[in-house]
Amino acid sequence: MLIIIRPSGEIALKSPRSRRNFEHTLANNIRSVIKEGKIWRSQGVLFLEVNDDNKNIEELSKVFGIASFSPVMSIKSYNNNLEDIINKAKEVFAEIVKGKIFSVRAKRIGSHNFTSLDVQRKVGEALYPFSRGVNLENPEVEVFIEIRNDVAYFYHKIIKGPKGLPVGVAGKTVVLFSGGIDSPVATWMMMKRGSIPVILNFNLGGSIHRKFVLEELSVLRKWSGGHKLKLFIVNGTDVLIKLSQIEKRNRVVMLKRVMYKVAERLCDKANAKSITTGESLSQVSSQTMTNLYVTEYGIKYPIFRPLIGFDKEEIVELARKIGTYQYSIKLPEYCAISTKARTSVELDEVLKDEENLNIDYEKVLENSEVIEI
């Protein structure tokens, strides 16, 4: 089976050098995902030759950087002969348009002795006897002919890809991954922008927490463009014991700050250039603007919050689409360690608590469990 793959539109807008780099990364990601067949680039698209099965279609639909793709039939060389194209179109499309209202869409790259309109008209005339009629505005079925120099491609399906950028073109980001509904969606959104996530999980729920985090990451792995996901699991219980020394109402913000500090160390270790969280403005007490300011104060890496303007319904909708919702919904809210958390914590208080607690963030990270998925 031959598949034509159309990269995301924004890739085409890059400089020639960047475009080559992005298309090269996309091709490598596809190779990693499909693991068989042959792939090559040509005039702004990619071609993939694989065994004829639906598994490849499903896998391609989760590769970031792909706008759409189509399984195609082709004439290798037709010597600029429109009659050859018409005959092949009848062979490929006669059953597809049978008893249906149809339209023909054609486009060309290269020099030919006919126009795209000629192709549409002549092929339409040839297919008309098999059909129930033609309607260019609202057809029941569309058939496509794409002529690239001396090769013509025939297809009737355009399968949507996830768009975005190929995973790997934007470097690494450390993701604070609780395993709730939000953090897997934030991870997915950063992968969509080309970033490789390094996962940092504070385990506050033992084996159950660990189990569901691993299941969520196995789902996200299908969207990673073949890149392995590295997971660092920190023993969060030890951190909670430390936090019991400070005022209850400050503990949630302080816990988040500890997470940021450990993430900062992991950025150093993993050569990541940012920290990503699933925080959404004012969704919970620790995510008010004041508390977010306090939480990230003094952190040297930029903090990305891809969900900052999303409401919960929008996040849930994305989680369902990604496939992580069914696992996230089973997890308790482990970070809710105080019933009377403050919506406006004073920075001076938190910095004083931090000094008194004197947590060794390097040691916390060193004692983490590392899993590659």
From Swiss-Prot:
<keyword id="KW-0694">RNA-binding</keyword>
<dbReference type="InterPro" id="IPR054173">
    <property type="entry name" value="ThiI_fer"/>
</dbReference>
<keyword id="KW-0963">Cytoplasm</keyword>
<dbReference type="InterPro" id="IPR050102">
    <property type="entry name" value="tRNA_sulfurtransferase_ThiI"/>
</dbReference>
<comment type="similarity">
    <text>Belongs to the ThiI family.</text>
</comment>
<dbReference type="GO" id="GO:0004810">
    <property type="term" value="F:CCA tRNA nucleotidyltransferase activity"/>
</dbReference>
<keyword id="KW-0784">Thiamine biosynthesis</keyword>
<dbReference type="InterPro" id="IPR049962">
    <property type="entry name" value="THUMP_ThiI"/>
</dbReference>
<comment type="function">
    <text>Catalyzes the ATP-dependent transfer of a sulfur to tRNA to produce 4-thiouridine in position 8 of tRNAs, which functions as a near-UV photosensor. Also catalyzes the transfer of sulfur to the sulfur carrier protein ThiS, forming ThiS-thiocarboxylate. This is a step in the synthesis of thiazole, in the thiamine biosynthesis pathway. The sulfur is donated as persulfide by IscS.</text>
</comment>
<dbReference type="GO" id="GO:0005524">
    <property type="term" value="F:ATP binding"/>
</dbReference>
<dbReference type="InterPro" id="IPR049961">
    <property type="entry name" value="ThiI_N"/>
</dbReference>
<feature type="binding site">
    <location>
        <position position="278"/>
    </location>
    <ligand>
        <name>ATP</name>
    </ligand>
</feature>
<protein>
    <recommendedName>
        <fullName>Probable tRNA sulfurtransferase</fullName>
        <ecNumber>2.8.1.4</ecNumber>
    </recommendedName>
</protein>
<comment type="pathway">
    <text>Cofactor biosynthesis; thiamine diphosphate biosynthesis.</text>
</comment>
<keyword id="KW-0808">Transferase</keyword>
<feature type="domain" description="THUMP">
    <location>
        <begin position="54"/>
        <end position="158"/>
    </location>
</feature>
<dbReference type="InterPro" id="IPR020536">
    <property type="entry name" value="ThiI_AANH"/>
</dbReference>
<dbReference type="Pfam" id="PF02926">
    <property type="entry name" value="THUMP"/>
</dbReference>
<feature type="binding site">
    <location>
        <begin position="201"/>
        <end position="202"/>
    </location>
    <ligand>
        <name>ATP</name>
    </ligand>
</feature>
<dbReference type="GO" id="GO:0009229">
    <property type="term" value="P:thiamine diphosphate biosynthetic process"/>
</dbReference>
<feature type="binding site">
    <location>
        <position position="287"/>
    </location>
    <ligand>
        <name>ATP</name>
    </ligand>
</feature>
<dbReference type="GO" id="GO:0002937">
    <property type="term" value="P:tRNA 4-thiouridine biosynthesis"/>
</dbReference>
<dbReference type="GO" id="GO:0140741">
    <property type="term" value="F:tRNA-uracil-4 sulfurtransferase activity"/>
</dbReference>
<dbReference type="InterPro" id="IPR003720">
    <property type="entry name" value="tRNA_STrfase"/>
</dbReference>
<feature type="binding site">
    <location>
        <begin position="176"/>
        <end position="177"/>
    </location>
    <ligand>
        <name>ATP</name>
    </ligand>
</feature>
<dbReference type="InterPro" id="IPR004114">
    <property type="entry name" value="THUMP_dom"/>
</dbReference>
<dbReference type="InterPro" id="IPR014729">
    <property type="entry name" value="Rossmann-like_a/b/a_fold"/>
</dbReference>
<dbReference type="Pfam" id="PF22025">
    <property type="entry name" value="ThiI_fer"/>
</dbReference>
<dbReference type="GO" id="GO:0052837">
    <property type="term" value="P:thiazole biosynthetic process"/>
</dbReference>
<dbReference type="Pfam" id="PF02568">
    <property type="entry name" value="ThiI"/>
</dbReference>
<dbReference type="GO" id="GO:0005829">
    <property type="term" value="C:cytosol"/>
</dbReference>
<keyword id="KW-0067">ATP-binding</keyword>
<dbReference type="GO" id="GO:0009228">
    <property type="term" value="P:thiamine biosynthetic process"/>
</dbReference>
<keyword id="KW-0820">tRNA-binding</keyword>
<keyword id="KW-0547">Nucleotide-binding</keyword>
<feature type="binding site">
    <location>
        <position position="256"/>
    </location>
    <ligand>
        <name>ATP</name>
    </ligand>
</feature>
<dbReference type="GO" id="GO:0000049">
    <property type="term" value="F:tRNA binding"/>
</dbReference>
